[in-house]
Every structure is written in C-alpha cells, then in structure tokens.
Amino acid sequence: GLDTVSFSTKGATYITYVNFLNELRVKTKPEGNSHGIPSLRKSSDDPGSSFVVAG
C-alpha cells in the first residue's frame, strides 16, 4: 500500500501543521533508489476543495 499523510484544517493549530509538514518530509524522503511519494488528501468542509495526490 501507499504511505499516507493527512491534515485537517478543522481545528488545526500551528503545532498540528508543523507535525504534518514533518511527517510529509519524512515520508517523501528517498529510500535507496526509489522515491516514495505519499498519498496526500486535504479534508475540508467544502468537498470542492478536497484533493488526492498519489505517486
């Protein structure tokens, strides 16, 4: 399966955002010869502003 990193803007704080960025940085780090790109899904109250990126 793909690695996933999630972040919700609802109830978000500076700390939760920093933790999200750190997790994203760790999971996108290249391992050996392969580069892993996690699934990234943005959750929001408006379904029109959600997105999924998978590599």
Swiss-Prot record:
Catalytic reaction(s) noted: Endohydrolysis of the N-glycosidic bond at one specific adenosine on the 28S rRNA
Record's protein name: Antiviral protein GAP-31
Function text: Single-chain ribosome-inactivating protein, possessing high antiviral potency and low toxicity to normal cells in culture and to intact animals. Capable of inhibiting HIV-1 infection and replication.
Gene3D superfamilies in the record: Ricin (A subunit), domain 1 (3.40.420.10)
Organism classification: Eukaryota, Viridiplantae, Streptophyta, Embryophyta, Tracheophyta
UniProt region (Disordered), positions on chain: 29-55
GO biological process: defense response to virus; negative regulation of translation
Organism: Suregada multiflora (False lime)
InterPro entries: Ribosome-inact_prot_sf, Ribosome_inactivat_prot_sub1
Gene Ontology MF terms: rRNA N-glycosylase activity; toxin activity
Similarity-based family: Belongs to the ribosome-inactivating protein family. Type 1 RIP subfamily.
EC supergroup of this enzyme: hydrolase
Assigned EC number: 3.2.2.22
